[in-house]
């Protein structure tokens, strides 16, 4: 039998043993992921590379602290330091987006969205958002998601000719459907949305306007994308896409919704907040107020436009590759492969061979199943965070265009990717297994 003293010593040893010694299997998997991120080009539109300071905050001792409630009104003792952190995160979020209210506790975007719907509608009420098949999100009413199970759903779609939103048709549909909540925002739509028009429609039919800006929040923070905050009753977002912060969610709103939203997050959706993630959000919101952040967002936009222009070239057109809507206003390009020899899965696999990570994505009116799809969603945020400039983005765009045009020399394209990855190193100085 182990004596109490020996047990205590053993526990102390475990608590001070580095990850590589305590769990080499997990350490090696993390090391492998870091090597993958360093040696490939990350172009999944919902991914980014966080600053090292965000890694440090999220990997801190704050993971030990339970803090149910809100600053000054906790259900646990010892919250004096996490109160400071949450206040910083809330205040900075309000400053960045010009919002009256912020809740920074949602664990993820889906939890933020669930809390928004809980605040604005009752189960069985009607909500109206962009169809998932046309670029919306699961939480905007998809039938297998909580939003599709708890609420009656009316979905609007893009125009079949232009693949853009037709606000006149959305208005007609809203008048006919009379939703309690009108939803703007998207997960795969490459153009600006008219938030003022959405608000006008919502007011006309007596609906609340909720905008999910998860994908384009970083561009909004940098004043490079129209802000939904002045128009919407409530705005939700993730923090890890264009914002480049930790994987988590956040809610912004007019002050009149503060009490309902706070209650819907806690105790409505969650128990204790993840204070290490809240700290990482605070850091991300500080970063979002800098000139360097704005420059990064500018390069994100420029990179996406360079990519769209290259994919509109004659060789890709001849191969049946089409840029949906002809271009982009945001950080991503939607590629339609319906007329090419590739489906979405094959396109994703082909670029993976080259060393570029993207995701297959359904296009509007897609004839293929969701696990195959007829499209690709390609984003530029992570590469902008890595430091790529106009010249480098032009090279990346040409690699992608050449690959999708067909009959490319995969080894030669991979060599070009390797050079770009070497020219723009990631997390220099981090040991393979060490996170901070």
UniProtKB/Swiss-Prot annotation:
Composition bias type Low complexity, residue spans: 1-18
GO cellular component: cytosol
Residues marked Plays an important role in substrate specificity (site): 240
CDD domains xrefs: SHMT
Catalysed transformations (reactions): (6R)-5,10-methylene-5,6,7,8-tetrahydrofolate + glycine + H2O = (6S)-5,6,7,8-tetrahydrofolate + L-serine
Lineage top rank: taxon: Bacteria
GO biological process: glycine biosynthetic process from serine; tetrahydrofolate interconversion
Gene Ontology molecular-function annotations: glycine hydroxymethyltransferase activity; pyridoxal phosphate binding
Region (Disordered): 1-22
Obligatory cofactor(s): pyridoxal 5'-phosphate
Residues modified to N6-(pyridoxal phosphate)lysine: 241
Keywords, comma-separated and alphabetical: Amino-acid biosynthesis, Cytoplasm, One-carbon metabolism, Pyridoxal phosphate, Transferase
Broad class of enzyme this protein falls into: transferase
UniProt-annotated location(s): Cytoplasm
Binding site for (6S)-5,6,7,8-tetrahydrofolate: 132, 136-138
Function: Catalyzes the reversible interconversion of serine and glycine with tetrahydrofolate (THF) serving as the one-carbon carrier. This reaction serves as the major source of one-carbon groups required for the biosynthesis of purines, thymidylate, methionine, and other important biomolecules. Also exhibits THF-independent aldolase activity toward beta-hydroxyamino acids, producing glycine and aldehydes, via a retro-aldol mechanism.
NCBIfam families in the record: PRK00011.1 (NF000586)
Subunit structure, as described in the record: Homodimer.
Protein's name in the database: Serine hydroxymethyltransferase
């Amino acid at each position: 039998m182990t004596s109490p003293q020996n047990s205590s010593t053993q526990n102390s040893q475990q608590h001070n043993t580095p990850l590589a010694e305590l769990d080499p299997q997990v350490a090696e998997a993390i090391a492998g992921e870091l090597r993958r991120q360093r040696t490939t080009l990350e172009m999944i539109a919902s991914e980014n590379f966080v600053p090292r300071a965000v890694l440090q905050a999220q990997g801190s001792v704050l993971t030990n602290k339970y803090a149910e409630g809100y600053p000054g009104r906790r259900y646990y003792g010892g919250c004096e330091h996490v109160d400071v952190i949450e206040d910083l995160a809330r205040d900075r979020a309000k400053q960045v987006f010009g919002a009256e209210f912020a809740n920074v506790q949602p664990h993820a975007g889906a939890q933020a969205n669930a809390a928004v719907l809980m605040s604005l509608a009752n189960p069985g009420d009607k909500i109206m958002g962009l169809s998932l098949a046309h670029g919306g999100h699961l939480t905007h009413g998809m039938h297998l998601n909580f939003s599709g199970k708890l609420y009656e759903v009316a979905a609007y779609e893009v125009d079949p000719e232009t693949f853009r939103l037709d606000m006149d048709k959305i208005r007609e549909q809203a008048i006919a459907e009379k939703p309690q909540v009108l939803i703007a925002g998207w997960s795969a739509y490459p153009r600006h949305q008219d938030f003022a028009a959405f608000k006008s429609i919502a007011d006309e039919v007596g609906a609340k306007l909720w905008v999910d800006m998860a994908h384009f929040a970083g561009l909004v923070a940098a004043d490079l994308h129209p802000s939904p905050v002045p128009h919407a009753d409530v705005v939700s977002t993730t923090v890890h896409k264009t914002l480049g912060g930790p994987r988590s969610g956040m809610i912004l709103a007019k002050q009149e919704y503060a009490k309902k939203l706070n209650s819907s997050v806690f105790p409505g959706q969650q128990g204790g907040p993840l204070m290490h993630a809240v700290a990482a959000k605070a850091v991300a919101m500080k970063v979002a107020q800098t000139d360097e952040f704005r420059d990064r967002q500018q390069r994100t936009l420029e990179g996406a436009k360079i990519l769209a222009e290259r994919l509109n070239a004659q060789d890709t057109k001849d191969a049946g590759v089409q840029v949906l809507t002809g271009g982009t206003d945001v950080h991503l390009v939607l590629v339609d492969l319906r007329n090419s020899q590739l489906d979405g899965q094959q396109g994703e696999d082909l670029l993976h061979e080259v060393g570029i990570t993207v995701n297959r994505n359904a296009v509007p009116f897609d004839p293929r199943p969701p696990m195959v799809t007829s499209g690709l969603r390609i984003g530029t945020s992570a590469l902008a965070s890595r430091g790529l400039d106009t010249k480098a983005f032009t090279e990346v765009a040409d690699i992608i265009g050449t690959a999708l045009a067909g009959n490319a020399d995969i080894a030669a394209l991979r060599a070009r990717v390797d050079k770009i990855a070497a020219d723009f190193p990631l997390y220099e100085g981090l040991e393979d297994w060490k996170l901070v």
